[in-house]
Amino acid sequence: HFFDVYYSKGLGWYRAQFPSSIQKYYAERVQKQQFMTGEASPYYLFHPYAPKRIAKILPQVKLVVLLRNPIDRAYSHYYHEVTGGHEKLSTFEEAIECEQERIGKETEELLRNEHYVSYKHRHFSYLSRGIYVDQLKVWMDLFPREQFLILKSEDFYADPAAGLRQVLEFISVPGEGLKAQKEAYEQLNTTKPPRMNAATRKRLVEYFEPYNAQLYAYLGVNYGWDK
């Protein structure tokens, strides 16, 4: 979360989160292993300043983006916030109804003040984060297309070995020894929320349909999320 929440801590703090040069030397020279580090934060894609901060500090970075059906992403996000104690509204429907009221002014303040950290923008942006096309355009204005690997989350989790192989090839790391069985890969956050109300899902299919169409046209890929 350095490039979104903890940027004010400075580059020294960020570097301290990674293995030291001594550890790298030991891995490469003594253990004869390739050494590469990375990090992940879903909020980076949505945060208005994360792209340009990363472009400034890591202009050659390779970017792996996982995109999930925005309806399922929003629903999962809501229950994640409930479980984490951040969300107090009792239903998903109430939360998405209140979203713009909660985060609208927060977004404005973020755009006015680069150093502002918004709790609401981070935790309650259920539908807004699913408008992927607008977010990707910001990133792709700063980085060339060849620095991105964009994967469909549903495909990645259905066949993690194949997905991981794509990632390793993208970052030029050998993929020898990868296990083919899905069961070999640990899954986190496996608790499934209750089934979404059918009327709510229908409404969100209609809401996201134009944004998904723009995304498909922009990337030249149809993810089949309109259901």
Positions of PLM-derived features:
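Acidic-and-aromatic substrate-binding clefts and catalytic sites of carbohydrate-active enzymes
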Residues: F3-L11, Y44-P48, L127, D155-D159
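Structural motif corresponding to alpha-helix initiation and N-cap regions
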Residues: S8-L11, P48, V133, A198-R201, ...
